[in-house]
Amino acid sequence: MNCLTDCDGSCCKIKKSVRAGLKEEGYTMYRSEAHFSRALLSVLNLRVPFVQRIESGVTGSGIPDIWLRWVPAEMWVELKNDSYVSINDAYWKIKWRKGQQAWAQDYRISCGRITYTIVAMRDGFIIVPMNKRYINNLVYQHDVWRVTKLQDVLSILKDESIKINFN
């Protein structure tokens, strides 16, 4: 569900006037991570040969939400939704749960590959490469890609999948 087109305001704390202004400017906002996930999966399923949503009650602590497979590349992606912040903010405090950054670092060290966190914000998306530990979960503009369209998220992930070290 897109908070700008399908929401009456009861699902979130975003003022109707703010929501209307963002909609007018062409931004997309999601009321939950699940709604963001569905929208992203609808784009990924059209362009990525294999996409698997992993998150469930039985997966281990820290495992990302989605696994993508391009031949010969593969990629793990964690999803977050924070409609109270902007892609133009100077920095963001990402709501990683305990173990998520540790899992990403263990995977990077053992497999030589980077996982990514995609955060849906009120006016776009940031893509965070998990190539280091972010102290206090703080991420700065120079650490991320900032985009306003889901299709651009896919383009960046695809470009990054080519750079992955398979040794």
Where is each model-derived feature located?
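Short, charged, amphipathic alpha-helix that recurs within catalytic cores of restriction-modification
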Residues: 89-117
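Short, electropositive alpha-helical surface patch
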Residues: 127-149
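Beta-rich catalytic cores
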Residues: 62
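Nucleic-acid nuclease catalytic cores
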Residues: 108-135
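Acidic-basic catalytic patches of nuclease active cores, encompassing PD-(D/E)XK
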Residues: 3, 12, 16-58
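Charged phosphate-binding loop/patch that engages nucleotide di/tri-phosphates or the phosphate backbone
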Residues: 16, 22-23, 143-167
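Cysteine-rich micro-motifs
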Residues: 9
